[in-house]
Design a protein with these regions (language model features):
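Charge-rich, well-structured scaffold segments of protease-associated domains
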Residues: 1-83, 98, 116, 124, ...
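His/Glu-based metal-binding/catalytic segments typifying zinc-dependent metallopeptidases
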Residues: 14, 83-139
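M16/MPP (pitrilysin/insulinase) zinc-metallopeptidase core fold and M16-derived inactive scaffolds
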Residues: 131-149, 161
Length: 175
């Protein structure tokens, strides 16, 4: 709530995906976080951190048979759980959201429907993101910040989830 860029991004996600888990604040509202107990956290870890939801990667010099044996024994010792639940793809909702706050800068975030995870077009989206606003050599940064001096910071982002994607342009400017 005290970081303008975070506040803008949470407001954008809430407006773009109303009623969807993707539209909820990452950390949750203070009331939910304050109500959590250690038992809640332990239950969450038991339910979510299971072999069915795990990705294991090995890179480097290793004996495949020995590693597989270690992994199979180690994973067999972990409690089982349900696989990842199916989630309906949320509908993207265009909106205008204003959140007045006493900050030294105005944090703007524009968002468009992006490319979901698993879509072949995601690679083109990643490249477009890099060119448009992916760093200090991007078109947005060079033109709007360096040449015109219109923004303190400016960048783009591409976020992909199952069935949904979001492309954003974020900027911090003078009021």
């Amino acid at each position: 709530e005290d970081v303008g860029e975070d506040l803008a991004h949470e407001a954008l996600c809430a407006a773009a995906w109303p009623g969807s888990p993707l539209g909820r604040p990452i950390c949750g509202p203070r009331s939910s976080v304050a109500a959590l107990t250690s038992a809640d956290l332990l239950r969450y870890v038991r339910e979510q951190y299971t072999p069915e939801r795990m990705v294991v990667v090995a890179a480097g010099a290793f004996d495949k048979a020995a590693l597989m044996d270690i992994l199979e024994r180690g994973l067999a010792a972990l409690p089982r759980g349900a696989g990842r639940p199916a989630v309906d793809a949320p509908a993207f909702s265009p909106a205008l959201t204003l959140r007045p706050k006493d900050f030294e800068q105005v944090c703007l975030e524009l968002g468009w429907r992006g490319i979901p995870a698993g879509d072949e077009r995601r690679y083109a989206m990643m490249l477009a993101n890099f060119i448009i606003g992916g760093g200090a050599s991007s078109r947005l940064f060079l033109r709007l910040r360096e040449e015109l001096g219109l923004a303190y910071s400016i960048y783009s982002g591409s976020y992909a989830d199952t069935g949904a994607g979001l492309f954003t342009v974020s900027a911090s400017v003078a009021p």
